[in-house]
Amino acid sequence: MDEKGLSNILQALNVVHSPESSRETRFSAQQLLDELKDSYSSPSVAIQLLELNEQAFSSLGCKLDIHIVQHFSLSLFETSVGMNWKSFSNKEKESVTSFLCKISLEDNNLLSVHFVRSKLASVFIEIAKRDWYNTWREEFDSFLQSLWSLSLQHRQLSSLILRGIMEDLYQYDDPVASLRSHILFNALISILSSSSTLHKLYPSGLPYSVTIPSNNEGWLIRWGNALESQDDALECLKCFKSCLSWVATDSIREANIVSHICQILVQGPIFLKTHAIDCIYICVTRTMEIDDPLWEIVEEMLSPSSLYTLHQVYTATSESINIKTLSSTTPEYILLKKLSETIVALGQYNYLDSNRRKCIKLTSLDTYSLLVLEIMKHPSLLISAISQHFWVLALRDPIISKHEKFQIVYPELLSIASERLLRFEDAVVELIPESATAKYLQEDVEGVSAVHSFCGNFRRFMFDIVRLTVSITPIESLNWIQNRFQSTVLGNMEDIQSQTEFFSKTSPLYLTMDVGFSTIEAFLHGVTRWNENTSDDPATYEIILQNLFLWCKQLVEINFKDPMLITRLISVLVLFTSILARENTTLLGVVLEKIISAVTYDNTSASYGFSDVQKINEMRSRCCFELVRLGELMPNPLMNIFDQLQSIIDQLDNATTLTGSEIVMLKTFLFVITQFSDVNIEVKNEYFEKLVGPVVKTWLDVQPPVNSPMEFLNHIGFPQMAEYLSAKYPYNADYTQFELDADAASYQSNLETGRKWLWPIKCLGRFCEATCSNKHIHPSEFEGQKNLWQVILPNVVPNLLKLVEQLHCCYEPSFISGLGMHNSSILQKSIVERFWLHGVSQISKNQFLEESYKMDVSANKLIHSFGHFLRRLREYCYYAIASFMRLGQAFFCVPGLSKQFLTAFFSHAAGLSLHQWTSMVNVVIKPYCVNCPAELRDECLLPLLPALLSELDHKLVSEWRRINDRGLLVEEDAEETGEDDDLSEEMIEESLLRHLTYATAKLITETFLQITPTQSRSNVSSSLIGKETVEGPVKLSEYVLDNAIICEPLLCTLCHLLVIHDSRTVGLVVNAFLAITPLLVSEQAHSLVREFICQQVFQSVILAIHDPYFESMQSDFIRLACIILSYSQGITDSAFQLLASIPALANQENLVPAFFNKFREASTLKIQKALLTRLLNSGRIVPRTDRRAVNAAILDVSAKEMLKRFEKSVSLQDEQKNDVLSRDEDTGLANLFE
């Protein structure tokens, strides 16, 4: 290029980097520079630019720092190598390489700044990935060693180059490295390890014509020796992090790397320690064979002296953290998290893995366990949580849990875990607001919802640790927990009795008592587990029972006035009773009396405020559930006093002000006793008729007329209410501005009295749920009980469905507008839904409830309560119908069910809100599809699913289009927002849409296609493709995919969901397509379905790959695209044609045809992905982003990633998921194709 051309380039760079440039001039200058990058001759220009000196810059009028020009020149090389290297002749390649090597070795100014060194390294990395051991062979290592022998900057450049190659090969999804992975691996091995080690490991030489150098010490030794220099250590440690997980362990031992790294961990500066601990983590967690020489190093790290040193480093790091200046970037805190994870992994990977355990000794198990205890005690709950999974696994391990060197930790483990049963999310408000724990929690977890989720899961882990510890040492645990009970519960009784106001959930005293009760619950669960696993020690069990009886007597004598404490006490007493009262009906009677007293706790006192009444009502509701739970746990003893219980409950029903829900729970209690007990089937059937018959009769007597919506509204008094409001208040008034006077309050009370006929609906649903639950206890009786229900359901279900139809009609805009101006206004106000959502609503939950209360003390109460009645009636109907579905054929054989169901739920779907749709999908549609017998699917599912899927698809597409036009407001991962209050409603609406979108995706993927997120994709695909070999009823997934009427709208919906900006939903949908695509593009598939996948779905996938929003999911999308291309080969070329139609690819001669040929020859999915990624990169379809590690071995200890790991570990083992004792009881769319 002549001098004028160079001057134009420099002037363009001036314009781009000048803050004074206008937008138009900057855009024009950038366009010139981009055109230069795309030019085949760009390397020659880059060479000219790099050969310019300061004087030449001045003469050409360049005002920029020379390093900016150097960086741009190197970017020309980088782009040209990426786009044109294959087109270069060997002479051109050698020319480029030689020039770059020369300036790297000779131009010290070029390497003086980091960003230029990094760009130069990137150029060498791109060349090496394409040409190392092609035309550029041993000379490459010679060049790197030449760099190493020069200055610090030269050594950094050599390390950057090698590290970049290793990371692209092993940590990043790099298509170029993937296509030459075998050659690059052997090339790296040849220079990392010493010549002597290589000859030992590869006596026949390395494959792929890679030579073993002569007398080469190898880069591992070279880096290891350089660790003694603090200036070089950082880059060397980074290189070790990139190779220690896969390089030969003989080379690691030869270079004495671990010893050097441990020395840095003990004595090095903080910034080196952080990288050193990453290296140690990689070493102790890497896969090793039983004869691996690295075991000696692992065992040495588990020696008492090494553990003592780790303990010292841990303590010193923890103490060095200044809590007042704590932040997510505090180096000491980052190191502490990495250190904690490494210590825990050291034991979890080696002590708790039955295969790895054979290679080490357990002599230091006690020292190690005490070190993990220190981690558990740390005030940071995030640090403490790192240890939890280790303890749960260790306590379940039959060898470790019984080892004498492990048992020494039990007393302190029990103490720490019990103390940490505290509800920290509430404690930080009043109990520990200024504590270190509160400060750590505030820094680690953002948002109310995230804090509650994390603390809840943290507490469940601690609960399980207490439970498992007790199940191993019951007697010792009993003595400690009884003493704790005396000090925590009984020791605070005086303060509790002196309280004149009810506790709140953040009250310090309540939280302290809650910890005590939770410890007791965990202990009782632990005792039960011990008894189930130990059947040969009745004497010890008898001692435990005697102590439990005396303990329970103390609890029974406690009389709390506070509703929240009463709830906790009742919960504990029910647990005690389930263990003790099988032989002690007196105790059972006392506990029953206490529960019934709580259920009938007076809530009418004039001294009670709104929050007080709420607490009492919540307590009564919880105690009703505890009563039913007692009936499930103790049906036989309760059956002995059934007549007395029924008499008491009948009296309560007649004499007290029980709500409909409370009546339902008491009747359910009686029903559960009769059906769960061991009396003979004839007696059970008699009680069934005795208990269910009156409820059915009551419902048939009180059920509203449902022939038309107006008839229904007349029955529930809407016209009368509207007339009353019209006469008393101005038209279209704001009723919250008018006081609820005595006359209006009396009228409202009469209206509410007339609405108490709801309870039989819910009661029948509860009875049916109990019948289905009893199937697991008395499976032989279930068929007979289904027959009893089969007689009842034809009398109940049709009218319930008709009632749902009329309810839905009340929400339909066309019906509302036809009621007249006044009535229309009132009904419209009644059905307005108000929500409070974590992280979205701009007010607290208590403020939301207070606002609702204010509505109820104004004239608006008439409207508000009417809307609440409609919602409650709808929920009861949904619940009852869903419960009946669990009976299977007994429900689905109701005459005319399919037509009635379709009419009820979809004839007025236009008025359903996002929340109502979500509720209907989750509560009704899912069980309807799951429980429908295979032989009735043509009758019950075939008419429903096409209409349902089309309606959902239309709803979601239209709502997302509207919200995208407005602009997204809610960050998926964010729980707190700083938006203005006037955006709250829009944000709530967007959140509700995300909920419906996710519910729809789960319905299709998990229910219809029967693909769960935890299933192996290969297993799912093989099971679907191999369905012809499976005997028995056709699976729902096969039925859905084999019916074109259903499959078409299903695939359309999934295709639309694939590009919605909601990562949770898209993750499910991508997983589903990965599973079903092999079947749907096979030769056996219908041609229309196959073409839909290869055209519409494939186009959506390419659009998603092009969308920066899906950056983190790019690998999965490319995988799906490869599966479509691969499985459709030889059947249809639609997907290939679509690729060839993309202008950015079609404009490049022979690019797509060459890709087709290589793709067809590719032997693995990894190679196919690399080929497709390279193709899309050539067309710049994949957005340019920072490289993302996909196989990184190092620890990401950002709070977000640590919380993700913690959430995964919450799902422990299958045993625990199915173990009732482990449950904590308080868990109530681009112009790309144009």
UniProtKB/Swiss-Prot annotation:
GO terms for molecular function: GTP binding; nuclear export signal receptor activity; nuclear import signal receptor activity; RNA binding. GO terms for biological process: protein export from nucleus; RNA export from nucleus. This is Uncharacterized protein C328.01c. The lineage of its organism: Eukaryota, Fungi, Dikarya, Ascomycota, Taphrinomycotina. GO terms for cellular component: cytoplasm; cytosol; nuclear envelope; nucleus; RNA nuclear export complex. InterPro entries: ARM-like (IPR011989), ARM-type_fold (IPR016024), Exportin-1/Importin-b-like (IPR013598), Exportin-5_C (IPR045478), XPO1/5 (IPR045065). Pfam families: Exportin-5, Xpo1. It comes from Schizosaccharomyces pombe (strain 972 / ATCC 24843).
